[in-house]
Amino acid sequence: AGVGRIGLIDNEKVDLSNLNRQIIHKTSSIGRKKVKSAIDSAVAINPEIRFSPYSKKLNKSNAISIISKYDIIADGSDNFDTRYLINDACYFLEKTLVSAAILGFDGQIFTFRPRGPCYRCIFSDPPKENLIPSCTEGGVLGSIAGIAGTIQATEVVKELLGIGRSLSSNLMIF
């Protein structure tokens, strides 16, 4: 869609268990850094894409400096600590956040605009530890990740271009 520069952050390496829901990676990518694998796959499709890779964990020390460089943030993280950290940084920096989360057969998408309701407004506190299973424990149907990612990407484009009906102030659950 021609969005300019894309920042991609992940500190993990591709694992066999990722392949059913992270189709940007191939079997030959197992053991490679996820950021490098994803960029290589995307550039193979469109060599004009520009990326800023961050092969590190997002944390309290680097979240503001990384997130401040982008107009809109798309969060597909798989843990609550990271979701809340991204939300808090976006809230502080007044950045639009498009959040996507999945587990099992379910997904949720929400667009949080500056000065509007935020992730913490809906989910004030992270769930107690071990209350909600991880993707590895609870499983994820691969097509659910694809649906969530497609809707999330569409929301990002709508927000960047100021077109269409946004999910802002509406939590989509499927």
What label would you give each PLM region?
Residues 1-174:
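Adenine nucleotide-associated cytosolic modules
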